[in-house]
Curated annotation (Swiss-Prot):
GO terms for molecular function: ATP binding; protein kinase activity; protein serine kinase activity; protein serine/threonine kinase activity. Residues 465-474, 550-559, 594-610 have a biased composition (Polar residues). Residues 32-384 form the Protein kinase domain. PROSITE patterns: PROTEIN_KINASE_DOM, PROTEIN_KINASE_ST. Residues 447-458, 502-517 have a biased composition (Low complexity). InterPro entries: CK1_Ser-Thr_kinase (IPR050235), Kinase-like_dom_sf (IPR011009), Prot_kinase_dom (IPR000719), Ser/Thr_kinase_AS (IPR008271). Serine/threonine kinase that phosphorylates baf-1, thus regulating the association of baf-1 with chromatin and nuclear membrane proteins during nuclear envelope formation. May act through the egl-17 signaling pathway. Essential in hermaphrodites for formation of the vulva, uterus, and uterine seam cells and for development and maintenance of the somatic gonad and thus the germ line. Acts to prevent cep-1 from triggering an inappropriate cell cycle arrest, thereby promoting germ cell proliferation. This is Serine/threonine-protein kinase VRK1.
Amino acid sequence: MPPKKAPAKKLHELAAEVRVGHKINDISKKTFIVGKQFATGGFGRIHTCTEEGKSQQMVMKIEPSTNGPLLTEVVVFNRILKKELIESYKKKKKISWIGLPYLIANGYFTYESEKMRYMIIPKYATSLEAVRETNGGTLAMKDSLTVASCILDALEYLHESDYAHADVKAANILLEKQGVYSTAVLVDFGLAHRTTNNVDKPDKKRAHNGTCIFTSTDAHRGNNPSFRGDIEILAYNLMMWATGTLPWMALESSPEKVFDAKQKFIAGLPGTLQNVLKNESSAVVGCIASMFDISMKTNYTDKVDMGKLKKLVTDAIQKTSSDGKKTPTRQKKLAEEDKNAVTPKRSTRRLAVKEESDNKDNDEVEVKPEKKATPRKRTTRKAVEVNNDSDDNEEQYENPKSKSSRTQTKSKRAKEEDVDDEEEIIIPKSSRSRSKVQLSGEGSDVTTPSSAASTSRSRSIRLGLTSSTASSNKVAKKIEQKYKRLSMNKSSLVPVTISVASDKSPTTSTPSSSSGLRSKRKSSEDVGEGITLKTQVLITPAIKKAKTKSGISSATKASPTELRRVPGVRNFPKGRRSMIIKETSAKYKERLASRQTKPTFDDSSCSSEV
Protein backbone atom coordinates (compact mmCIF):
# COMPACT_ATOMS: atom_id res chain seq x y z
CA MET A 1 0.00 0.00 0.00
CA PRO A 2 1.55 3.33 -1.04
CA PRO A 3 2.19 5.89 1.73
CA LYS A 4 -0.36 8.62 2.25
CA LYS A 5 0.46 11.99 0.79
CA ALA A 6 1.17 14.78 3.23
CA PRO A 7 -1.52 17.50 3.35
CA ALA A 8 -0.83 20.37 0.99
CA LYS A 9 0.50 23.49 2.59
CA LYS A 10 -1.50 26.68 2.49
CA LEU A 11 -0.75 28.92 -0.47
CA HIS A 12 0.20 31.85 1.76
CA GLU A 13 1.13 31.67 5.43
CA LEU A 14 0.93 34.59 7.82
CA ALA A 15 4.31 35.69 9.10
CA ALA A 16 5.25 35.17 12.73
CA GLU A 17 4.96 38.24 14.96
CA VAL A 18 8.23 40.14 15.15
CA ARG A 19 8.77 41.87 18.47
CA VAL A 20 9.01 45.64 18.65
CA GLY A 21 12.63 46.82 18.74
CA HIS A 22 14.05 43.97 16.69
CA LYS A 23 16.95 45.22 14.55
CA ILE A 24 17.44 44.25 10.90
CA ASN A 25 20.77 44.83 9.17
CA ASP A 26 20.35 45.67 5.49
CA ILE A 27 22.83 44.84 2.74
CA SER A 28 23.37 48.59 2.33
CA LYS A 29 24.87 48.55 5.86
CA LYS A 30 21.89 50.35 7.32
CA THR A 31 20.10 49.13 10.44
CA PHE A 32 16.31 49.32 10.67
CA ILE A 33 14.36 48.95 13.93
CA VAL A 34 10.97 47.21 13.77
CA GLY A 35 8.09 49.20 15.26
CA LYS A 36 4.46 48.41 16.09
CA GLN A 37 2.29 46.34 13.79
CA PHE A 38 -0.69 48.35 12.46
CA ALA A 39 -2.11 46.11 9.70
CA THR A 40 -2.05 42.66 8.14
CA GLY A 41 -2.34 41.55 4.53
CA GLY A 42 -2.79 38.32 2.62
CA PHE A 43 0.98 37.94 2.52
CA GLY A 44 2.08 38.97 6.01
CA ARG A 45 2.28 41.80 8.51
CA ILE A 46 2.78 45.55 8.15
CA HIS A 47 4.86 47.40 10.78
CA THR A 48 6.21 50.87 11.28
CA CYS A 49 9.99 51.12 11.39
CA THR A 50 12.78 53.65 11.73
CA GLU A 51 16.37 53.79 10.63
CA GLU A 52 18.77 53.60 13.55
CA GLY A 53 19.75 57.09 14.61
CA LYS A 54 16.82 58.75 12.79
CA SER A 55 13.26 59.53 13.84
CA GLN A 56 11.43 59.49 10.50
CA GLN A 57 8.94 56.63 10.40
CA MET A 58 8.61 54.27 7.44
CA VAL A 59 6.53 51.20 6.58
CA MET A 60 7.95 47.68 6.65
CA LYS A 61 6.15 44.72 5.07
CA ILE A 62 7.15 41.28 6.37
CA GLU A 63 6.20 37.80 5.09
CA PRO A 64 7.68 34.28 5.20
CA SER A 65 10.22 33.71 2.46
CA THR A 66 8.04 30.93 1.02
CA ASN A 67 5.16 33.33 0.22
CA GLY A 68 4.73 34.92 -3.20
CA PRO A 69 2.72 38.19 -3.04
CA LEU A 70 5.43 40.30 -1.40
CA LEU A 71 8.00 38.78 -3.75
CA THR A 72 5.91 39.97 -6.71
CA GLU A 73 5.75 43.45 -5.21
CA VAL A 74 9.49 43.49 -4.50
CA VAL A 75 10.17 42.60 -8.14
CA VAL A 76 7.92 45.46 -9.36
CA PHE A 77 9.63 47.97 -7.03
CA ASN A 78 13.10 46.87 -8.09
CA ARG A 79 12.20 47.11 -11.77
CA ILE A 80 10.22 50.34 -12.07
CA LEU A 81 9.72 52.00 -8.64
CA LYS A 82 13.20 52.93 -7.54
CA LYS A 83 13.53 56.53 -6.43
CA GLU A 84 15.93 57.52 -9.22
CA LEU A 85 13.62 56.09 -11.91
CA ILE A 86 10.62 58.04 -10.59
CA GLU A 87 12.62 61.29 -10.38
CA SER A 88 13.82 60.82 -13.95
CA TYR A 89 10.23 60.32 -15.17
CA LYS A 90 9.05 63.49 -13.38
CA LYS A 91 11.77 65.54 -15.10
CA LYS A 92 10.86 64.05 -18.46
CA LYS A 93 7.14 64.85 -18.05
CA LYS A 94 7.89 68.18 -16.32
CA ILE A 95 5.68 67.36 -13.35
CA SER A 96 6.35 67.87 -9.65
CA TRP A 97 4.31 64.96 -8.30
CA ILE A 98 3.38 61.43 -9.21
CA GLY A 99 1.25 59.24 -6.96
CA LEU A 100 3.58 56.25 -6.58
CA PRO A 101 5.78 55.09 -3.65
CA TYR A 102 9.47 54.32 -4.06
CA LEU A 103 11.62 51.53 -2.68
CA ILE A 104 13.79 52.31 0.36
CA ALA A 105 15.17 48.86 1.20
CA ASN A 106 14.38 45.16 0.88
CA GLY A 107 15.97 41.82 1.71
CA TYR A 108 15.81 38.80 4.05
CA PHE A 109 16.37 38.28 7.77
CA THR A 110 16.04 35.37 10.20
CA TYR A 111 13.74 35.59 13.20
CA GLU A 112 13.39 32.65 15.62
CA SER A 113 14.89 30.24 13.07
CA GLU A 114 12.41 31.35 10.38
CA LYS A 115 13.60 33.09 7.23
CA MET A 116 11.53 36.16 6.35
CA ARG A 117 11.33 38.64 3.50
CA TYR A 118 10.93 42.37 4.14
CA MET A 119 10.45 45.55 2.12
CA ILE A 120 10.52 49.18 3.30
CA ILE A 121 8.65 52.07 1.64
CA PRO A 122 7.64 55.60 2.77
CA LYS A 123 4.85 56.09 5.32
CA TYR A 124 1.78 58.15 4.42
CA ALA A 125 -0.90 59.88 6.51
CA THR A 126 -4.01 57.75 5.94
CA SER A 127 -5.89 55.63 3.43
CA LEU A 128 -8.74 56.81 1.23
CA GLU A 129 -10.87 53.95 2.55
CA ALA A 130 -10.54 55.28 6.11
CA VAL A 131 -11.62 58.73 4.91
CA ARG A 132 -14.57 57.24 3.03
CA GLU A 133 -15.76 55.29 6.07
CA THR A 134 -15.43 58.39 8.23
CA ASN A 135 -17.63 60.31 5.77
CA GLY A 136 -20.38 57.69 5.92
CA GLY A 137 -19.25 55.57 2.96
CA THR A 138 -19.06 58.28 0.31
CA LEU A 139 -16.75 61.04 -0.89
CA ALA A 140 -17.49 64.44 -2.38
CA MET A 141 -17.51 64.19 -6.17
CA LYS A 142 -14.85 66.88 -6.53
CA ASP A 143 -12.54 64.96 -4.17
CA SER A 144 -13.26 61.69 -5.97
CA LEU A 145 -12.37 63.18 -9.36
CA THR A 146 -9.21 64.77 -7.89
CA VAL A 147 -8.09 61.36 -6.62
CA ALA A 148 -8.97 59.81 -10.00
CA SER A 149 -6.73 62.35 -11.74
CA CYS A 150 -3.78 61.33 -9.50
CA ILE A 151 -4.46 57.64 -10.12
CA LEU A 152 -4.55 58.19 -13.91
CA ASP A 153 -1.08 59.78 -13.69
CA ALA A 154 0.18 56.80 -11.66
CA LEU A 155 -1.40 54.30 -14.08
CA GLU A 156 0.15 56.15 -17.02
CA TYR A 157 3.60 55.61 -15.50
CA LEU A 158 2.87 51.91 -14.87
CA HIS A 159 1.43 51.36 -18.36
CA GLU A 160 4.43 53.02 -20.00
CA SER A 161 6.56 50.60 -17.96
CA ASP A 162 4.40 47.70 -19.34
CA TYR A 163 2.72 46.96 -16.00
CA ALA A 164 -0.98 46.77 -15.11
CA HIS A 165 -1.96 47.29 -11.47
CA ALA A 166 -5.17 45.16 -11.43
CA ASP A 167 -6.26 46.11 -7.88
CA VAL A 168 -7.22 49.80 -7.77
CA LYS A 169 -9.46 50.52 -4.75
CA ALA A 170 -9.76 52.98 -1.88
CA ALA A 171 -7.89 50.66 0.52
CA ASN A 172 -4.87 50.73 -1.83
CA ILE A 173 -4.88 54.53 -2.21
CA LEU A 174 -3.07 56.57 0.45
CA LEU A 175 -3.04 60.31 1.14
CA GLU A 176 0.32 61.97 1.73
CA LYS A 177 -1.41 64.58 3.94
CA GLN A 178 -4.70 64.37 5.79
CA GLY A 179 -7.49 66.00 3.77
CA VAL A 180 -5.29 66.69 0.70
CA TYR A 181 -6.59 64.67 -2.27
CA SER A 182 -4.30 66.11 -4.95
CA THR A 183 -1.36 64.01 -3.67
CA ALA A 184 -3.02 60.58 -3.56
CA VAL A 185 -0.66 57.60 -3.86
CA LEU A 186 -1.40 54.20 -5.44
CA VAL A 187 0.16 51.31 -3.48
CA ASP A 188 0.02 47.49 -3.17
CA PHE A 189 1.46 45.87 -6.29
CA GLY A 190 0.84 42.29 -5.20
CA LEU A 191 -1.38 41.64 -8.24
CA ALA A 192 0.58 43.81 -10.67
CA HIS A 193 1.30 42.03 -13.95
CA ARG A 194 3.76 42.64 -16.76
CA THR A 195 1.75 42.82 -19.98
CA THR A 196 4.46 42.18 -22.60
CA ASN A 197 3.32 38.59 -23.12
CA ASN A 198 -0.44 39.16 -22.82
CA VAL A 199 -2.64 37.01 -25.03
CA ASP A 200 -6.44 37.22 -25.11
CA LYS A 201 -6.87 33.62 -24.01
CA PRO A 202 -9.01 33.16 -20.86
CA ASP A 203 -7.95 30.61 -18.27
CA LYS A 204 -10.54 29.40 -15.77
CA LYS A 205 -7.85 28.97 -13.12
CA ARG A 206 -7.30 32.73 -13.15
CA ALA A 207 -11.02 33.64 -13.30
CA HIS A 208 -12.32 36.34 -10.92
CA ASN A 209 -8.82 37.28 -9.74
CA GLY A 210 -8.68 40.52 -7.73
CA THR A 211 -11.27 42.28 -5.57
CA CYS A 212 -14.53 40.79 -6.83
CA ILE A 213 -16.78 43.88 -6.79
CA PHE A 214 -14.16 46.05 -8.55
CA THR A 215 -12.24 43.67 -10.78
CA SER A 216 -12.51 43.97 -14.57
CA THR A 217 -14.56 41.79 -16.88
CA ASP A 218 -11.25 40.58 -18.39
CA ALA A 219 -10.23 39.22 -14.98
CA HIS A 220 -13.68 37.63 -14.50
CA ARG A 221 -13.19 35.72 -17.76
CA GLY A 222 -9.75 34.49 -16.66
CA ASN A 223 -7.50 36.82 -18.65
CA ASN A 224 -4.34 38.36 -17.24
CA PRO A 225 -4.57 41.97 -16.02
CA SER A 226 -4.75 44.52 -18.84
CA PHE A 227 -4.42 48.27 -19.40
CA ARG A 228 -8.09 48.67 -20.24
CA GLY A 229 -8.97 46.64 -17.17
CA ASP A 230 -7.34 49.26 -14.89
CA ILE A 231 -9.59 52.00 -16.35
CA GLU A 232 -12.70 49.85 -15.94
CA ILE A 233 -11.77 49.18 -12.30
CA LEU A 234 -11.23 52.92 -11.67
CA ALA A 235 -14.70 53.69 -13.11
CA TYR A 236 -16.30 51.18 -10.71
CA ASN A 237 -14.48 52.88 -7.83
CA LEU A 238 -15.82 56.31 -8.82
CA MET A 239 -19.35 54.87 -8.68
CA MET A 240 -18.61 53.44 -5.23
CA TRP A 241 -17.17 56.69 -3.88
CA ALA A 242 -20.16 58.68 -5.15
CA THR A 243 -22.96 56.43 -3.87
CA GLY A 244 -21.37 54.22 -1.20
CA THR A 245 -22.50 51.04 -2.96
CA LEU A 246 -22.59 49.15 -6.26
CA PRO A 247 -25.52 47.39 -8.00
CA TRP A 248 -23.87 43.98 -7.43
CA MET A 249 -22.66 44.58 -3.88
CA ALA A 250 -25.05 41.98 -2.42
CA LEU A 251 -23.73 39.34 -4.86
CA GLU A 252 -20.08 39.59 -3.74
CA SER A 253 -20.03 36.04 -2.39
CA SER A 254 -20.88 34.70 -5.87
CA PRO A 255 -18.28 35.92 -8.44
CA GLU A 256 -20.21 34.44 -11.38
CA LYS A 257 -23.32 36.47 -10.50
CA VAL A 258 -21.19 39.58 -10.08
CA PHE A 259 -19.74 38.99 -13.55
CA ASP A 260 -23.23 38.63 -15.06
CA ALA A 261 -24.41 41.81 -13.33
CA LYS A 262 -21.40 43.76 -14.66
CA GLN A 263 -22.01 42.55 -18.21
CA LYS A 264 -25.67 43.65 -18.07
CA PHE A 265 -24.62 46.99 -16.60
CA ILE A 266 -22.08 47.67 -19.36
CA ALA A 267 -24.55 46.61 -22.06
CA GLY A 268 -27.09 49.13 -20.74
CA LEU A 269 -24.74 52.14 -20.64
CA PRO A 270 -25.25 55.09 -20.30
CA GLY A 271 -28.80 54.52 -18.98
CA THR A 272 -27.73 52.11 -16.24
CA LEU A 273 -25.08 54.58 -15.05
CA GLN A 274 -27.63 57.41 -14.91
CA ASN A 275 -29.87 55.25 -12.71
CA VAL A 276 -26.98 54.73 -10.28
CA LEU A 277 -25.76 58.36 -10.27
CA LYS A 278 -29.16 60.05 -10.01
CA ASN A 279 -27.91 62.87 -7.79
CA GLU A 280 -24.82 63.72 -9.85
CA SER A 281 -24.48 66.29 -12.62
CA SER A 282 -24.50 65.38 -16.31
CA ALA A 283 -20.79 66.30 -16.53
CA VAL A 284 -19.88 63.69 -13.90
CA VAL A 285 -22.10 61.02 -15.44
CA GLY A 286 -20.68 61.78 -18.88
CA CYS A 287 -17.10 61.55 -17.60
CA ILE A 288 -17.56 58.12 -15.99
CA ALA A 289 -19.58 56.86 -18.98
CA SER A 290 -16.71 57.91 -21.28
CA MET A 291 -14.25 55.97 -19.12
CA PHE A 292 -16.33 52.83 -19.60
CA ASP A 293 -16.68 53.56 -23.32
CA ILE A 294 -12.92 54.04 -23.85
CA SER A 295 -12.17 50.90 -21.85
CA MET A 296 -14.58 48.76 -23.87
CA LYS A 297 -13.37 50.10 -27.24
CA THR A 298 -9.67 49.51 -26.46
CA ASN A 299 -8.23 46.17 -27.55
CA TYR A 300 -7.06 43.76 -24.87
CA THR A 301 -3.33 44.24 -25.57
CA ASP A 302 -3.47 47.94 -26.50
CA LYS A 303 -2.68 50.87 -24.23
CA VAL A 304 -5.41 53.31 -23.29
CA ASP A 305 -5.46 56.94 -24.48
CA MET A 306 -4.52 58.49 -21.15
CA GLY A 307 -4.42 62.03 -22.53
CA LYS A 308 -8.10 61.87 -23.47
CA LEU A 309 -9.07 60.36 -20.12
CA LYS A 310 -7.18 62.98 -18.09
CA LYS A 311 -8.82 65.78 -20.09
CA LEU A 312 -12.29 64.31 -19.38
CA VAL A 313 -11.57 64.17 -15.65
CA THR A 314 -10.05 67.68 -15.57
CA ASP A 315 -13.10 69.15 -17.34
CA ALA A 316 -15.44 67.35 -14.92
CA ILE A 317 -13.49 68.75 -11.94
CA GLN A 318 -13.78 72.30 -13.29
CA LYS A 319 -17.53 71.97 -13.88
CA THR A 320 -18.02 70.44 -10.44
CA SER A 321 -16.02 73.30 -8.88
CA SER A 322 -18.07 75.94 -10.70
CA ASP A 323 -21.31 74.26 -9.59
CA GLY A 324 -20.00 74.15 -6.05
CA LYS A 325 -19.24 77.88 -6.09
CA LYS A 326 -22.78 78.77 -7.17
CA THR A 327 -24.37 76.87 -4.36
CA PRO A 328 -22.65 78.73 -1.48
CA THR A 329 -23.52 82.06 -3.14
CA ARG A 330 -27.17 81.10 -3.22
CA GLN A 331 -26.99 79.87 0.36
CA LYS A 332 -25.30 83.09 1.44
CA LYS A 333 -28.05 85.13 -0.19
CA LEU A 334 -30.75 83.14 1.57
CA ALA A 335 -28.89 83.47 4.87
CA GLU A 336 -28.79 87.25 4.48
CA GLU A 337 -32.52 87.33 3.79
CA ASP A 338 -33.17 85.27 6.90
CA LYS A 339 -30.93 87.58 8.93
CA ASN A 340 -32.99 90.62 7.89
CA ALA A 341 -36.17 89.05 9.21
CA VAL A 342 -36.78 89.52 12.94
CA THR A 343 -37.64 86.31 14.71
CA PRO A 344 -39.75 86.87 17.84
CA LYS A 345 -38.44 85.33 21.03
CA ARG A 346 -40.45 82.57 22.65
CA SER A 347 -42.46 83.85 25.59
CA THR A 348 -45.64 82.97 27.43
CA ARG A 349 -46.46 86.60 27.92
CA ARG A 350 -48.92 88.44 25.73
CA LEU A 351 -47.12 90.18 22.89
CA ALA A 352 -48.07 93.38 21.18
CA VAL A 353 -47.09 93.22 17.51
CA LYS A 354 -46.33 96.52 15.86
CA GLU A 355 -45.64 96.72 12.15
CA GLU A 356 -43.20 99.28 10.94
CA SER A 357 -44.44 101.22 7.94
CA ASP A 358 -41.31 103.36 7.51
CA ASN A 359 -39.36 100.71 5.61
CA LYS A 360 -41.43 99.63 2.64
CA ASP A 361 -38.79 97.38 1.10
CA ASN A 362 -38.32 95.14 4.12
CA ASP A 363 -41.60 94.09 5.72
CA GLU A 364 -40.20 93.56 9.18
CA VAL A 365 -42.31 93.01 12.23
CA GLU A 366 -41.17 94.46 15.53
CA VAL A 367 -42.29 92.45 18.50
CA LYS A 368 -42.52 94.29 21.82
CA PRO A 369 -43.63 92.71 25.06
CA GLU A 370 -46.45 94.45 26.90
CA LYS A 371 -45.48 96.60 29.84
CA LYS A 372 -44.73 94.48 32.85
CA ALA A 373 -47.31 94.64 35.63
CA THR A 374 -46.30 95.99 39.01
CA PRO A 375 -45.16 93.02 41.08
CA ARG A 376 -47.23 92.21 44.15
CA LYS A 377 -45.68 92.08 47.60
CA ARG A 378 -45.15 88.66 49.02
CA THR A 379 -47.59 87.38 51.60
CA THR A 380 -46.54 86.52 55.14
CA ARG A 381 -45.87 82.94 54.07
CA LYS A 382 -42.33 82.01 53.11
CA ALA A 383 -43.29 79.96 50.02
CA VAL A 384 -45.66 81.01 47.28
CA GLU A 385 -48.75 78.83 46.91
CA VAL A 386 -49.55 77.69 43.40
CA ASN A 387 -53.28 77.85 42.70
CA ASN A 388 -55.00 76.31 39.73
CA ASP A 389 -57.29 79.31 39.23
CA SER A 390 -56.83 80.91 35.84
CA ASP A 391 -57.74 84.31 37.26
CA ASP A 392 -54.69 84.30 39.54
CA ASN A 393 -52.38 83.42 36.65
CA GLU A 394 -53.74 86.17 34.43
CA GLU A 395 -53.30 88.82 37.12
CA GLN A 396 -49.55 88.87 36.52
CA TYR A 397 -49.98 90.17 32.98
CA GLU A 398 -52.85 92.64 33.48
CA ASN A 399 -52.38 96.33 34.10
CA PRO A 400 -52.01 97.30 37.76
CA LYS A 401 -55.25 98.15 39.53
CA SER A 402 -56.00 100.99 41.84
CA LYS A 403 -54.58 101.04 45.32
CA SER A 404 -57.84 100.03 47.00
CA SER A 405 -58.49 97.11 44.63
CA ARG A 406 -54.95 95.82 45.19
CA THR A 407 -55.47 95.87 48.94
CA GLN A 408 -58.69 93.89 48.58
CA THR A 409 -56.98 91.37 46.30
CA LYS A 410 -54.13 90.92 48.77
CA SER A 411 -56.47 90.31 51.68
CA LYS A 412 -58.55 87.90 49.62
CA ARG A 413 -55.48 85.92 48.53
CA ALA A 414 -54.19 85.84 52.10
CA LYS A 415 -57.48 84.32 53.24
CA GLU A 416 -57.40 81.77 50.45
CA GLU A 417 -53.86 80.80 51.38
CA ASP A 418 -54.84 80.45 55.03
CA VAL A 419 -57.57 77.96 54.25
CA ASP A 420 -55.59 76.33 51.46
CA ASP A 421 -54.41 73.25 53.34
CA GLU A 422 -56.91 70.95 54.97
CA GLU A 423 -55.16 69.23 57.83
CA GLU A 424 -55.76 65.78 59.25
CA ILE A 425 -55.42 64.97 62.94
CA ILE A 426 -55.90 61.71 64.81
CA ILE A 427 -57.52 61.74 68.24
CA PRO A 428 -57.21 58.64 70.43
CA LYS A 429 -60.35 57.21 72.01
CA SER A 430 -58.84 57.66 75.45
CA SER A 431 -58.65 61.42 75.07
CA ARG A 432 -62.10 61.99 73.56
CA SER A 433 -63.57 62.57 76.99
CA ARG A 434 -61.12 65.41 77.53
CA SER A 435 -62.01 67.18 74.28
CA LYS A 436 -65.03 69.20 73.43
CA VAL A 437 -66.02 69.56 69.77
CA GLN A 438 -68.48 72.16 68.61
CA LEU A 439 -69.76 72.31 65.07
CA SER A 440 -70.84 75.35 63.13
CA GLY A 441 -73.13 75.58 60.09
CA GLU A 442 -70.48 76.27 57.47
CA GLY A 443 -67.42 74.71 59.09
CA SER A 444 -66.16 73.30 62.35
CA ASP A 445 -64.01 74.63 65.19
CA VAL A 446 -62.47 72.43 67.87
CA THR A 447 -62.79 73.99 71.33
CA THR A 448 -60.75 72.46 74.15
CA PRO A 449 -61.09 73.84 77.72
CA SER A 450 -57.72 74.06 79.40
CA SER A 451 -58.87 73.93 83.07
CA ALA A 452 -61.76 74.79 85.42
CA ALA A 453 -60.30 78.24 86.05
CA SER A 454 -60.41 79.12 82.36
CA THR A 455 -63.94 77.86 81.62
CA SER A 456 -65.30 81.43 81.63
CA ARG A 457 -63.17 82.18 78.58
CA SER A 458 -62.79 79.38 75.98
CA ARG A 459 -60.75 79.65 72.87
CA SER A 460 -61.44 78.41 69.35
CA ILE A 461 -58.42 76.77 67.79
CA ARG A 462 -58.30 76.43 64.06
CA LEU A 463 -56.24 73.38 63.39
CA GLY A 464 -53.84 73.56 60.46
CA LEU A 465 -53.97 77.38 60.12
CA THR A 466 -51.35 80.02 60.78
CA SER A 467 -52.78 81.46 63.99
CA SER A 468 -51.65 84.54 65.81
CA THR A 469 -52.06 82.75 69.14
CA ALA A 470 -48.87 80.89 69.93
CA SER A 471 -50.46 78.42 72.37
CA SER A 472 -53.11 77.22 69.92
CA ASN A 473 -50.49 76.66 67.26
CA LYS A 474 -48.36 74.73 69.71
CA VAL A 475 -51.22 72.46 70.80
CA ALA A 476 -52.25 71.73 67.22
CA LYS A 477 -48.72 70.77 66.28
CA LYS A 478 -48.32 68.50 69.30
CA ILE A 479 -51.56 66.66 68.54
CA GLU A 480 -50.52 66.25 64.96
CA GLN A 481 -47.00 65.08 65.78
CA LYS A 482 -47.96 62.47 68.35
CA TYR A 483 -51.06 60.87 66.95
CA LYS A 484 -50.15 61.02 63.32
CA ARG A 485 -47.16 58.84 64.10
CA LEU A 486 -49.07 56.50 66.40
CA SER A 487 -51.82 55.99 63.83
CA MET A 488 -49.44 53.91 61.71
CA ASN A 489 -49.29 51.11 64.33
CA LYS A 490 -52.28 51.42 66.73
CA SER A 491 -55.76 50.44 65.60
CA SER A 492 -57.31 52.34 68.53
CA LEU A 493 -56.50 55.65 66.89
CA VAL A 494 -59.27 57.13 64.79
CA PRO A 495 -58.38 59.64 62.04
CA VAL A 496 -60.55 62.72 62.01
CA THR A 497 -60.70 64.98 58.96
CA ILE A 498 -61.81 68.43 60.07
CA SER A 499 -63.01 70.87 57.45
CA VAL A 500 -61.92 74.45 58.07
CA ALA A 501 -64.47 77.07 58.98
CA SER A 502 -65.17 79.89 56.60
CA ASP A 503 -63.54 83.19 57.42
CA LYS A 504 -66.77 85.03 56.69
CA SER A 505 -68.72 83.50 59.57
CA PRO A 506 -66.37 82.35 62.32
CA THR A 507 -68.04 80.86 65.37
CA THR A 508 -66.81 80.91 68.92
CA SER A 509 -68.16 78.93 71.81
CA THR A 510 -68.39 80.11 75.41
CA PRO A 511 -69.77 77.15 77.28
CA SER A 512 -70.14 77.03 81.05
CA SER A 513 -68.53 74.35 83.12
CA SER A 514 -71.75 72.35 83.25
CA SER A 515 -72.19 72.46 79.50
CA GLY A 516 -68.59 71.31 79.17
CA LEU A 517 -69.39 68.26 81.27
CA ARG A 518 -72.41 67.51 79.15
CA SER A 519 -70.32 67.73 76.03
CA LYS A 520 -67.96 65.11 77.44
CA ARG A 521 -70.85 62.67 77.65
CA LYS A 522 -71.84 63.22 74.05
CA SER A 523 -71.56 60.11 71.99
CA SER A 524 -69.57 59.85 68.81
CA GLU A 525 -72.85 59.84 66.87
CA ASP A 526 -73.67 63.37 68.10
CA VAL A 527 -70.23 64.58 67.25
CA GLY A 528 -70.24 62.89 63.84
CA GLU A 529 -72.50 65.48 62.26
CA GLY A 530 -69.51 67.44 60.94
CA ILE A 531 -66.60 65.09 61.66
CA THR A 532 -66.07 61.77 59.92
CA LEU A 533 -64.54 59.12 62.19
CA LYS A 534 -63.01 56.05 60.60
CA THR A 535 -60.93 53.18 61.90
CA GLN A 536 -57.40 52.58 60.73
CA VAL A 537 -58.51 49.78 58.40
CA LEU A 538 -60.91 52.08 56.56
CA ILE A 539 -58.38 54.82 55.94
CA THR A 540 -57.87 55.34 52.22
CA PRO A 541 -55.17 57.26 50.37
CA ALA A 542 -57.81 59.74 49.25
CA ILE A 543 -58.42 60.77 52.89
CA LYS A 544 -54.75 60.92 53.82
CA LYS A 545 -54.02 63.03 50.78
CA ALA A 546 -56.93 65.40 51.22
CA LYS A 547 -57.06 67.90 48.41
CA THR A 548 -56.91 71.58 49.19
CA LYS A 549 -59.30 74.27 48.16
CA SER A 550 -57.15 74.98 45.10
CA GLY A 551 -57.55 71.36 43.95
CA ILE A 552 -53.85 70.48 44.45
CA SER A 553 -52.93 68.01 47.18
CA SER A 554 -50.01 68.44 49.56
CA ALA A 555 -48.33 65.37 48.07
CA THR A 556 -48.48 66.98 44.63
CA LYS A 557 -47.01 70.22 45.95
CA ALA A 558 -44.17 68.32 47.61
CA SER A 559 -43.16 66.73 44.29
CA PRO A 560 -41.52 69.06 41.72
CA THR A 561 -42.33 66.60 38.92
CA GLU A 562 -46.03 66.45 39.78
CA LEU A 563 -46.22 70.18 40.47
CA ARG A 564 -44.77 70.96 37.06
CA ARG A 565 -47.70 69.14 35.43
CA VAL A 566 -50.33 71.33 37.08
CA PRO A 567 -52.01 73.34 34.27
CA GLY A 568 -51.83 76.68 36.04
CA VAL A 569 -48.08 76.37 36.64
CA ARG A 570 -47.37 76.33 32.90
CA ASN A 571 -48.71 79.88 32.58
CA PHE A 572 -45.82 81.32 34.60
CA PRO A 573 -42.70 82.56 32.77
CA LYS A 574 -39.97 79.95 32.57
CA GLY A 575 -37.61 81.39 35.18
CA ARG A 576 -40.41 82.37 37.53
CA ARG A 577 -42.04 78.94 37.15
CA SER A 578 -38.87 77.10 38.20
CA MET A 579 -38.46 79.33 41.26
CA ILE A 580 -42.07 78.82 42.36
CA ILE A 581 -41.87 75.05 41.90
CA LYS A 582 -38.61 74.89 43.86
CA GLU A 583 -39.87 76.99 46.76
CA THR A 584 -43.25 75.24 46.97
CA SER A 585 -41.87 71.71 46.87
CA ALA A 586 -39.18 72.58 49.43
CA LYS A 587 -41.82 73.96 51.80
CA TYR A 588 -44.05 70.91 51.67
CA LYS A 589 -41.13 68.48 51.86
CA GLU A 590 -39.96 70.28 55.02
CA ARG A 591 -43.48 70.10 56.45
CA LEU A 592 -43.75 66.35 55.81
CA ALA A 593 -40.29 65.77 57.25
CA SER A 594 -41.09 67.71 60.42
CA ARG A 595 -44.18 65.58 61.00
CA GLN A 596 -42.15 62.39 60.86
CA THR A 597 -39.00 63.40 62.73
CA LYS A 598 -40.18 65.52 65.69
CA PRO A 599 -40.20 63.68 69.08
CA THR A 600 -43.39 62.51 70.77
CA PHE A 601 -44.77 63.83 74.05
CA ASP A 602 -46.81 62.56 76.95
CA ASP A 603 -50.65 62.46 76.94
CA SER A 604 -50.85 64.19 80.27
CA SER A 605 -48.83 67.20 79.13
CA CYS A 606 -50.99 67.54 76.04
CA SER A 607 -54.27 67.38 77.96
CA SER A 608 -53.08 69.82 80.60
CA GLU A 609 -52.06 72.42 78.04
CA VAL A 610 -55.34 71.97 76.19
